[in-house]
């Protein structure tokens, strides 16, 4: 039997999902298949290490420095990074002032948003639609990745991790059974002792256990933070972003109550502060 046409499933603002099919030549007798996302969404939130979040200047500080742009810290912007070498100590202090900087988020309302956030380019997989193989259009993959915060972190360092999480977590099972590399090859995870990866103990993941978590969508988000400030302050900002992410999926009619947090380096300290009642106070929304 011929493989069916897999249609891209679109999620609308009211939460409904739809797909559009086109007419084909009469010789093409393949059917069309629309894959609907699960009703449950469990966002995966990545928090980077120190200096791993891109920062921008406030309008006032940009004016004081007479800069042509508002970049404070963006290592992947090579010319701006090189220019920092030739700044005086006083200028560098003004550029990296915790009170005059904030996370450089992707804003669709900015006319040059895509150009500014071009550090995220050539994303190989993103599961924002219901297609078995992810979003087909390259530009749409990049745009959706930026909307998920991938461009507010150092993508050259974290891009592989974000794409691996997005791909692996959203391609775990098909027809209730482990898919592809979950079940075979160098990256096999099912029936592999965790000691193979350096764990002290623990039992191997079974196909049955994997099947119990396949009925969810795992959209991967990155949340940058102002690493010039205290981790306690950063945790409060990250907590607010997490609640916004949960609200976003709830508005799309998904069952979404908590997120999974993945951290790197100092992001782990932010993560600890995130669930501390005196700082992020987000223990109720972190799995």
Functional labels for PLM-detected ranges:
Residues 1-262, 268-287:
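N-terminal non-catalytic accessory region
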């Amino acid at each position: 039997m011929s493989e069916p046409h897999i249609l891209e499933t679109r999620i609308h603002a009211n939460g409904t999902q739809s797909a559009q099919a086109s007419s084909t030549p009469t010789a093409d007798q393949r059917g069309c298949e629309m894959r609907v996302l699960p009703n449950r969404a469990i966002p995966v939130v990545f928090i980077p290490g120190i200096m791993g979040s891109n920062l921008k200047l406030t309008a006032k500080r940009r004016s004081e420095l007479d800069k042509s742009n508002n970049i404070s810290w963006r290592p992947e912007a090579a010319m701006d990074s090189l220019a920092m070498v030739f700044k005086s100590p006083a200028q560098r202090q003004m550029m990296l002032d915790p009170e005059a900087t904030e996370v450089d988020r992707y804003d669709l309302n900015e006319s040059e948003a895509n150009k500014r956030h071009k550090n995220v380019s050539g994303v190989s997989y993103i599961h924002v639609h219901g297609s078995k193989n992810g979003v087909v259009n390259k530009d749409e993959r990049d745009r959706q990745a930026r909307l998920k915060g991938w461009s507010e972190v150092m993508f050259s360092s974290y891009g592989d991790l974000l794409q691996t999480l997005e791909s692996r977590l959203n391609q775990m099972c098909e027809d209730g059974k482990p898919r592809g590399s979950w079940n075979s090859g160098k990256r096999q995870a099912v029936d592999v002792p965790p000691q193979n990866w350096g764990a002290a103990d623990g039992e191997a993941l079974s196909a049955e256990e994997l099947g119990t978590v396949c009925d969810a969508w795992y959209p991967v988000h990155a949340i940058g933070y102002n690493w010039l400030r205290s981790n306690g302050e950063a945790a409060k900002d990250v907590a607010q972003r997490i609640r916004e992410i949960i609200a976003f999926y709830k508005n799309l009619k998904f069952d979404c109550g908590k997120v999974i947090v993945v951290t790197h380096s100092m992001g782990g300290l932010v993560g600890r502060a995130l669930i501390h009642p005196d700082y992020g106070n987000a223990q109720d929304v972190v799995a």
